[in-house]
Amino acid sequence: KVHRPGPGANLAYAGPRLEDYKNCFSAKTAEAEAAYADLVGLIQALGGGKNVLYEQVLGSQMVADDFLRTMAVMLMAGCFDQLTGWNPHNYYLYRHPVTQQWSYLPWDLDVGFADKAFGKVPVIDGWHAAWPLPGGPPKPILENIVKDPKLLASYRKFARSILESYFRPEKLKARLSKLYALIEEPLRTDPFPPRRVTNPEDTGYESILDSIERFIEKRYALAAAQLKDPGERPKTISQSHRPPMEPQPGTLPHA
C-alpha cells in the first residue's frame, strides 16, 4: 500500500536499498513483507530501457489491459489524487499468487468530478484523454505506455469504450440524481458543511450537484473530441497538489 509519496512511489527506480522503499510502500501481509526485493524488481522492469518492447515488459509484469482501463476510468472521473493522475500515492499493488502478475488498485478516491480542484489543479484541461500524462512528478510507467504505439492504441480503444459506456452525460447525470435522492433527507441533519473540499466555491448541496454535472458535461465533450482527433502530444503541466486535511463536523477547512 502506498499512502504517501516517497522513494519509488511513482514507480521509478530509487536504488537497490530495500529500506528506502519501505518509507512509502507498506506491506499488508507477511508474504508482502518478504517480497520487497520482488517489488524493487517490478519497479526496475517498469522503467523500461533502450531496445525494449514495453508492450512485452508491461504484459509480463502486470495485468496490462486492466491497468490501461484503470487509467481511462481515473481520467474520465477526474480522480487525480493517485498514481495515474497527479500524485504518486493512494494505491495498492497486488501480486497474484499463481500468475505472479501485479495489479494496480487505486484507493481513497474522494476528490473526483471536480475541475480546477482546490482552485488550482486543471483536472480537465491538464489531463488529455488521448495523451494520458497529467502533471505532478514524472511517472515512468505512463511515459513508457504513451511512447509505445501498441499500448497507446490499446489505451485509446479502452478509453473510447469506457467513455461511451459509462460517462455519457445523460447516463451519468441520471445516476447522480438517483443517488442524491437516496441521501437527500439524511443530509439535512449531516454535521459536515455542505461543500466539497475540492470546491471552495460550493454553497450547498444543489451547488455541489451543479458543479459535478458541469464537470461531467465538459469532461465528456473534451474527451470525445480528443480521442477522435488526438493531435500532437501536449506539454505536461508539471503541477502537483496535496489535498488539505479533511473538514471536521461543523467546521470549514482553512483557505
PLM segments and residue spans:
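Phosphate/dinucleotide-binding and metal-coordinating scaffold of catalytic cores
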Residues: 1-255
